[in-house]
Amino acid sequence: MPIPFADGMLSRLGRRGAALDLIEEFEDESGEPPASLSPADLLAAEPALLLQKMENRLVRHHLANPDVLSGEQLRKLRYILNFARLADFEPGAAGPGGSRGRGDISVGGQVAPWRSRGVDALYAPLREEPDPVTALEGAKDVLATLVDDQDDQRRVLIERHGSDFSATELDAEVGYKKLVTVLGGGGGAGFVYIGGMQRLLAAGQVPDYMIGSSFGSIIGSLVARELPVPIDEYAEWAKTVSYRAILGPERRRSRHGLAGKFTLRFDQFAHTLLSRADGERMRMSDLAIPFDVVVAGVRRQPYAALPSRFRHRERSTLTLRSLPFLPIGIGPWVAARMWQVAAFIDLRVVKPIVISADGATRDVNVVDAASFSSAIPGVLHPETSDPRMLPILDELCADQDVAAMVDGGAASNVPVELAWERVRDGRLGTRNACYLAFDCFHPHWDPRHLWLVPITQAVQLQMVRNLPYADHLVRFEPTLSPVNLAPSAAAIDRACRWGRDSVEPAIAVTSALLEPTWWEGDRPPAAEPKERTKSAASSMSAVMAAIQAPTGRFRRWRSRHLT
């Protein structure tokens, strides 16, 4: 939404024009297709994305006009679109009984001619036609011309790859989608995600893969730790957060972050929550739901040019920031630093780094990954307290050629594009997914938080790149204040209610996209849900028992207002 005076404020700071120029520059450098590309160019650049958008529109039109297509016609149109998306996939990975380990098979070259024909035939009704009913009727007419040839295409592919996959495994790849949930940053505004997850889980939609940035990485790490997800217990756990528990005076020395007013002590507060039953800290590979964390790596050249207050932690004592007790609040010093955070939201300054359970980062502690992803430059500064992590983080910074790690939102606050690329590159084995994005940090007009305007505006420029990859974007509203990192119990309850209400309209869309499709017979490919592996996480009863709530009136006041 437009924000009064925001444009004038940004132009006075000389930032608005530069930011818009950067968006054009980043799109040119990325090689990703802008929305203005022709169908042929978009198909050549990213055919799977074009077909994803066509299926999305088909499903939305059908939800609004359910009497135009029969259930069978909708199912077969969706099957054709998803069959045309086939390229690389891992046989056996798709569907509720999917398993990994067989490696990828490539069929993209064989499917390419059929892909081109399908796109040419369905592009007009599913991308160009503005009237939903006319679009559905046009798609129905096209279906009649494609059915016989689709049957031949499917049969030939199965015959050619009889030793690679079965007909059931092919139909599972085409017919079943994984639910990918993207959790964006936004500080205390992100507590609404707990309610959003409550509604999602109540609908039976458990994420198959998640990726989180900034505060979204904290909520994501909770949801991913064990199955079934004890989301109501997480809401109760959130009510125990206090400023004194999560913030402290800045450390004088650090190896992997920037200087800031506060040390982020999330690793201490969430130690039991994100530890295994044997007492060891949970690693990315221990999570029950595949989960990736986005952090922003500060490039070495921009890092060297930063003001010394960002780089030299030892100067903390000179500004009295090492005192053991600090008042909580957005005073002039913190507000001034927050204005400067917008300068980090620039891909020339930072680069996205994905910490995942595959590859070299599989042994990174979950709590450390979430802490670095939430490290607001110049304000919140984390550092691992686990000696085992030091060489791992050293190697990560060296491999990525970065000097420090900061808030993942600086690189990608709602990282839908990264999630899409991770799935395309084989994160789940299957490449067929529904992408649901959560965004709690979008522009609001609030005279109390004018200092947030440059940040929210810069983050919204990132959405130009990310939005095309989402099947549905939930913009949570209302939310708690982004600066309210330790809400009261009543505020958590409100945030959960707002979160449930915000996600409600998305359920119909995700339910329709997750509905399986098939080509032959009267039901989807038979698949038995795989047996759930035992969670490595500590029990929630042990987590809640380990929390020591302050007793006494003064201690409760100090916990809420002092570090």
Where are these regions (language model features)?
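C-terminal helical/tail subdomains of lipid-metabolizing enzymes
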Residues: 2-4, 107, 378, 399, ...
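Helix-rich "cap/lid" substructures immediately adjacent to catalytic or cofactor-binding pockets
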Residues: 147-210, 563
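A short alpha-helix-loop-beta-strand transition element characteristic
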Residues: 275-291
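Active-site gating loop/helix substructures
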Residues: 292-421
